[in-house]
């Protein structure tokens, strides 16, 4: 093995005869060397040994691991081949939400974003990077060792894909060096390079198997395999693009986004070589045009570029909106377009009641797929386009995912073209379709009655924060509706144990317990009942405010928009939603049926000032509470008049910090917000009980 270019220590170890006494240090040295060569190859782009030399080292390690399996290390490169297949993916709650980005589609959009940012924080530089078309991934390292990995999911909860991520050769199983934090979350994009995608489809073609449409679908499908051996065979890659949670928070990190990416690279994580800092708006546009021009020649698929405010302090000042950071934007590339014929328009009703026009198209191949349907969004979009049935239209796959009509070809309009009439009544249930002033989306107002909304309405009605029917999970609701045992929330209270034994995996004992839970749920509170009705934009707090203000369901049912606007935190839009909901006869019939079935609640007495000592205050909960669950603590604080928010700001009056409190505690301390522990909270609640 004298031809292998190794460090002196490894050379000395490999020259020894292997025994049970020295096998472990030899294997550790091999792991360390192979992992370092992986980083040099995938991260530094500067390999120091040949592929054949690497293969010989790997083969030697495999031989030793076969002889001494008790010494196999968790970070051994041999562990990337995949393990036992899973039955399903476990759910993981992200330590910090994985937010999505707002989009810019042209220079005007980005200029507006730039103005919003610079108006708030002054001059800014941007860290610009290609927007990889793959799957967002969170990877958690503890003491430098890869502990877990998860998909983005809905941003709050993702799927545990740890074993699959370990098969990606460019992701280190152990970080390089020793200057990393005790706990560090790395966020990035898992993707399939174009060459790997072509090879994968070629193998499928030879086996007469179904081909993947594009590299993104291939990457997503590969990463979500229950059998990690399949993932290991798919040649996925990864680029890190951000830090997530870092603990301890006192660990010194770079002050700019670009420098933080270089820190990630120094720890052995791959970072795109196309990243660049731009100080001027003109440089940003030049970067965009450069990447767009070279798009086809890049080794991976991209659908735009991402621009992030480079200064971390400015990022923190800008903060976040509900689902995205204010300091970053995805500047999307123009999607591919084709012309085809609009043959008709159908109207679909979604689970939330949104009535959406769907274009039926003469099938056309665009953006890598055959498209026969496209969204027309809403009535405003139909009017803006001036589109009619029979028109020749231009189809674009917006964001390379959702086909949409972007224009018509007027000169090709036939004489018999027909105008598109938006329905006045729901095509599913016949209820009035409402469209409030200032809103683009039209909605069916028969929320409790409409078949299209039925499953979601009843799931919500039975949920923990609504009627709280213990044991009535989503799967049971779906079965009840599919078997036509339930058609409205009131039908839940007609169910008997014997009826529910018809459900899958529902024995008489479980059915009896569920019947008892349904009976118990009849006694509730007016705020819970109002929340359970699923009125648009009426959450727990708004439901409580409505109940407190009007005192009874009877008074609320006949309230005018003017009266509703007088309720705390209710504006004209929410007032219109409430008024329209109670104006629908179908909804009133369901409410009357619920009351006739025995649903009841105690009368509400208006709280005195003494009973609401926290009125006007904003509180935030963070960390783990041992004696109260989060919802109970929230409800009790609200009963004392507090508004319970989800994030800390300068308007926060008090933060309750449980165990393992993280970024919210740090933010509160930074802003000088009062912080109390669980014991102090319990004392406060006891004193006001």
Swiss-Prot record:
Catalyses which reaction(s): NAD(+) + (deoxyribonucleotide)n-3'-hydroxyl + 5'-phospho-(deoxyribonucleotide)m = (deoxyribonucleotide)n+m + AMP + beta-nicotinamide D-nucleotide
Enzyme class of the recorded protein, top EC level: ligase
Residue positions binding NAD(+): 51-55, 100-101, 129, 152, 189, 308, 332
EC number: 6.5.1.2
Keywords of this entry: DNA damage, DNA repair, DNA replication, Ligase, Magnesium, Manganese, Metal-binding, NAD, Zinc
Active site annotation, chain numbering: 131 (n6-amp-lysine intermediate)
GO CC terms: cytosol
Example GO biological process: DNA replication
UniProt cross-references to SUPFAM superfamilies, sorted A to Z: BRCT domain, DNA ligase/mRNA capping enzyme, catalytic domain, Nucleic acid-binding proteins, RuvA domain 2-like
Domain BRCT: 609-689
Positions in coiled-coil regions: none
A GO molecular function held by the record: DNA binding
Family per record: Belongs to the NAD-dependent DNA ligase family. LigA subfamily.
Protein name: DNA ligase
């Amino acid at each position: 093995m004298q031809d292998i270019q190794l460090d002196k220590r490894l050379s000395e170890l490999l020259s020894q005869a292997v025994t049970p006494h020295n096998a472990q240090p030899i294997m550790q040295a091999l792991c360390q060397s192979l992992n370092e060569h992986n980083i040099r190859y995938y991260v530094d782009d500067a390999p120091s040994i040949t592929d054949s030399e690497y293969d010989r080292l790997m083969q030697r390690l495999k031989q030793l691991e076969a002889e001494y399996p008790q010494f196999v290390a968790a970070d051994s490169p041999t562990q990337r081949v995949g393990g036992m297949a899973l039955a399903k993916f476990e759910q993981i709650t992200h330590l910090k939400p994985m937010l999505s980005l707002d989009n810019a589609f042209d220079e005007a959009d980005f200029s507006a974003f730039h103005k919003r940012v610079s108006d708030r924080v002054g001059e800014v530089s941007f860290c610009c990077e290609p927007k990889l078309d793959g799957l967002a991934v969170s990877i958690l390292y503890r003491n430098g060792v890869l502990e877990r990995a998860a998909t983005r999911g809905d941003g709050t909860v993702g799927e545990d894909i740890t074993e699959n991520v370990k098969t990606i050769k460019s992701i280190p199983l152990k970080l390089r060096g020793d200057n990393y934090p005790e706990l560090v979350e790395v966020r990035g994009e898992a993707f399939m390079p174009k060459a790997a995608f072509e090879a994968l489809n070629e193998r499928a073609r030879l086996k007469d198997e179904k081909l993947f449409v594009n590299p993104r679908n291939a990457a997503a499908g590969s990463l979500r395999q229950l059998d990690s051996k399949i993932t290991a065979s798919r040649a996925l890659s990864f680029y890190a693009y951000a830090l997530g949670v870092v603990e301890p928070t006192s660990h010194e990190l770079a002050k700019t986004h670009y420098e933080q990416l270089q820190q990630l690279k120094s720890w052995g994580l791959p970072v795109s070589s196309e990243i660049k800092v731009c100080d001027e708006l003109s440089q940003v546009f030049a970067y965009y045009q450069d990447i767009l021009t070279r798009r086809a020649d890049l080794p991976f698929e991209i659908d735009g570029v991402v621009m992030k405010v480079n200064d971390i302090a400015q990022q923190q000042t800008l903060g976040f909106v509900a689902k995205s950071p204010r300091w970053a934007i995805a500047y999307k590339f123009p999607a591919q377009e084709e012309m085809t014929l609009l043959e008709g328009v159908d109207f679909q009703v979604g689970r939330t009641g949104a009535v959406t026009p769907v274009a039926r198209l003469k099938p056309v191949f665009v953006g890598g797929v055959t498209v026969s349907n496209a969204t027309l969004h809403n009535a405003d979009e139909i009017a803006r386009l001036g589109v009619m049935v029979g028109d020749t239209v231009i189809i674009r796959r917006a964001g390379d995912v959702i086909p949409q009509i972007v224009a018509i070809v007027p000169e090709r309009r036939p004489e018999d073209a027909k105008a598109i009439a938006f329905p006045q009544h729901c095509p599913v249930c016949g209820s009035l379709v409402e469209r409030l002033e200032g809103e683009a989306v039209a909605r069916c107002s028969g929320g409790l009655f409409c078949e299209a909304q039925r499953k979601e309405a009843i799931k919500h009605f039975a949920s923990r924060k609504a009627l709280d029917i213990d044991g009535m999970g989503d799967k049971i609701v779906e079965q009840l509706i599919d078997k036509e045992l339930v058609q409205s929330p009131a039908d839940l209270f007609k169910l008997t144990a014997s009826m529910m034994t018809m459900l899958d995996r529902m024995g008489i004992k479980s059915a009896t317990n569920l019947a008892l839970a349904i009976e118990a749920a009849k006694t509730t509170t007016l705020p819970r009942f109002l929340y359970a009705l699923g009125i648009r934009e009426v959450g727990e707090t708004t439901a409580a405010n409505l109940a407190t203000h009007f005192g009874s369901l009877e008074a609320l049912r006949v309230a005018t928009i003017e009266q509703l606007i007088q309720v705390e935190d209710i504006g004209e839009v929410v007032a219109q939603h409430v008024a329209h909901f109670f104006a629908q006869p179908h909804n009133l019939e369901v409410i009357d049926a619920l009351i006739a079935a025995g649903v009841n609640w105690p009368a509400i007495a208006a709280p005195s000032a003494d009973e609401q000592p926290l009125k006007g205050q904003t509180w935030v909960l963070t960390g783990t509470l041992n004696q109260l669950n989060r919802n109970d603590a929230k409800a009790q604080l609200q009963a004392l008049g507090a508004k319970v928010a989800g994030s800390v700001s300068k308007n926060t009056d008090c933060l309750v910090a449980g165990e393992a409190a993280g970024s919210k505690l740090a933010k509160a301390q930074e802003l000088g917000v009062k912080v109390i522990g669980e014991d102090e909270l319990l004392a406060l609640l006891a004193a006001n009980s």
